[in-house]
Amino acid sequence: GTARASVASAISIGKQRAMVRTLKAQRARFITEVLASTPNYETRNIEPGFVAVCSSDMDGDIRSLSGFVPVAEYGKRKTICDFELGSVDDVRYITHPIFSPWLNGGAANNATFLCGGASTGAIDVYPVLMFGEEAFGHTALRDMWALDLKHSPPKASDSDPAGQRGSLAATSWYRCGILNQGWIVRGEFAATA
């Protein structure tokens, strides 16, 4: 479907390829480089590709995609981060529980898919963000004054007669933003229970 409320299927190789076609049509560049196989047993070449991030609830669905290569079979074992799950065609997947779904946001409850813990609710909708190089940017604004430290030395009081508790806090600056909307795509899927 085209509306979030009609989502009732897991990610498929066809849907992934449609997302990749969209990025390529916008001339998005790959983020990762080729990883060559090694003489070690059962290692494989990994194509250059885009990066996709999603909830770890989708691990099983991604692993079941045709052509999935787990990180354990990467030739050089060079991962993007500790949470990289694997690669399918020219997409490398990073999964983590921090990427949460829209609970009960999809089609009517179906025992096949996760439904936010409520047996009467709708299917949970999981976003998959896929992006190319320089689709977004971020920077910590730094110089000698970027970190502002606040220190409150301990003082004796009725609640702290020995003056043992003080506080220390810091503030800093950070900026991020989308640099090219055409180089980021979002697919919305259900996750198999």
Which sequence ranges carry the predicted segments?
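Sequence/fold signature of self-assembling virion shell proteins
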Residues: 2-37, 48-53, 57-193
